Amino acid sequence: GLAAGLPPEQQIAARLAAQGFDLLIPAIISRDKLETEDARTQQADMTQREWIYRQAFHMGRHVIGYDVQRILGAVDWFAQNKPATAKIGMVGYGEGGLLALHAAAIDPRIDVTLISGYFNSSEAIWSEPIYRNVWRRSLSLGNAEVAALVMPRTLLIEHSEFPLVTGHKGDLSTPAKESVRAEFERIRYEQNDAPRQLFVEKNDEPTTRWSDETFTAFLNRFDLKPSEGTVAFDSDRRADAVARIAERKARCVRQAEEHVQSLVQQSEHVRDKFFLYNVKPEWQERPWSTDKSHAIEKPETFIAAAADYRRKFATEAMGRFDLSLASPNARTRKVAETELWTAYDVVLDVHDSLFAWGTLVIPKNMKPEERRPVVVCQHGRNGVPRDTIDNHTTAYNDFAAKLAERGFVTYAPHNLYRGEDQYRWLDRKANAIGCTLFSFIIAQHDQTLTWLSTLPFVDGDRIAFYGLSYGGETAVRVPPILEKYCLSICSGDFNQWTRKVASTDQPFSFMRTIEWEMPYWNLGHSFDYAEMTYLMFPRPFMVERGHHDGVGRDQWVAHEFAKVRYLYAQFGMSDRVDIEFFQGGHSINGQGTFDFLHKHLNWPAPDSEQ
């Protein structure tokens, strides 16, 4: 509102100053492009707001929240330094309008709020820039509901042209007047004379930003009338103004980042208190001991308590659709055959418009009425089921086929993380209703398990999971929830997940990649990989880790795994958990993991290995 080049009527700060208002204009985190010399981060193509959004979202914080706190700090200053009878007003345009609306909803000290270039229906909030993504927003708090929280204080909404924003993992454009008016009419307040107004042009087109009608209505709430004169301002008379403004913007980002990173560093203790030490408080402060051995504890209490955490993880972290599974209606076709096995593509109905598919590999040496164990072999990002069977890649090493040659029935399901941003938009839409990409995947696997258990040659009590990369990510999310999986193997993914997603000082962090769907709301304060794996107990669990796998670092993998082994050991079940490090990269090694499958699925290894 003071910038050079703006028409006088759009210089809202100057106009307010001319009316005698004391002004405080908080600096907020910019939507300018993030400047960095790191080549990988450059490829991620982030704005400064997205940079904060990504790391903060995973820690239960939000870039919107940080900016609202700055605004409330300004309100604090006015409340402390002005007479108690003085009214406090707030105006905001575009991103500032979003912040003004939310700040006014939170702080009753704000008497009058004017927003412009923001208000609209929240139905398509998923299509707006990624830094506006708010968990469960569409379920309970659309713009109308937030606006209702401002009542009975004054809220003035001006339908002006929105800022044009494209390419921010979402776009902004001026909505149709019908959409704005419909959302305005949804604002509920128990009194009919609620002090809210919507300003549009007489032809219902967007009005000029800070129109005379809107400005006058704002002044009237302070018992003021528009003055005849104007106040002319230079944008900044200081010679170093441009540098100061740039530093102020950088400081806003730096302050938010420093706070988020402090949460990342301390999050391990928060998670311990949330889960392990809440269930087993006596483990938090164990006395010093020189005993050669300690007593084994009974697991029943932990298993019972973990059931509630399993529900929380499924419904609050991953998200669950409140829908019943459809009849599977399986459709199959033969797609490959060797001397040792036959492969079939399978399609299963899950929900309306959602299906599951994969490739079933059946050994040829099965006896009549024999029921064999199954290994579900999961591909990674941008993969397809056949990658695990006969595409001869060095990552998968045809492990589903090799396991079939060892006598296991194998099934390679297709997971939805294919097509890069196509699946990310699916996750983004799901976030608006408290769900994620895994809400779809869990339902697909649930149906798959149900169907596999009906096959006459399958032992439904011996269905294992083994996944690489994003498939390894699946290994610590789906089997912990779906207890029909009797064991799980995580390959090429097990990590200290909070640092993997939200840290800005780790070279393996998603903060340096294009994978903007990886933050999960507040997961850093609830479930890291140790906590997810606790939900597997007492079922067997294994990690496969290549020393040269860039997905993480050995020390962080070992750090997180040590917590898992500790849990199993306290209950005398350390033989059910294992980790194998090998001199390789992001790949299926198929050595210790194959032994693990033979052992815990009670299936004999080939004669040459016995």
Q: Where would I find each of the regions flagged by the language model?
A:
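Beta-sheet entry/capping signal
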Residues: 20-24, 87-89, 111-113, 153-156, ...
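Accessory cap/linker subdomain of secreted extracellular hydrolases
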Residues: 33-74, 177-181, 190, 264-269, ...
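Short, flexible loop/turn elements at secondary-structure junctions
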Residues: 30, 94, 348-352, 362-365, ...
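Cap/lid segment of the alpha/beta-hydrolase catalytic domain
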Residues: 1-79, 93, 120-129, 367-454, ...
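Alpha-helix capping and helix-loop boundary segments enriched in small/acidic/polar residues
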Residues: 3-7, 42-47, 58-69, 91, ...
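Alpha/beta-hydrolase-fold serine-hydrolase catalytic core, especially in secreted/extracellular enzymes
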Residues: 4, 18-22, 54-63, 108, ...
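Primarily recognizes the serine-hydrolase "nucleophile elbow" in alpha/beta-hydrolase
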Residues: 69, 73-149, 450-523
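Alpha/beta-hydrolase-fold catalytic nucleophile elbow
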Residues: 27, 91, 116-117, 158, ...
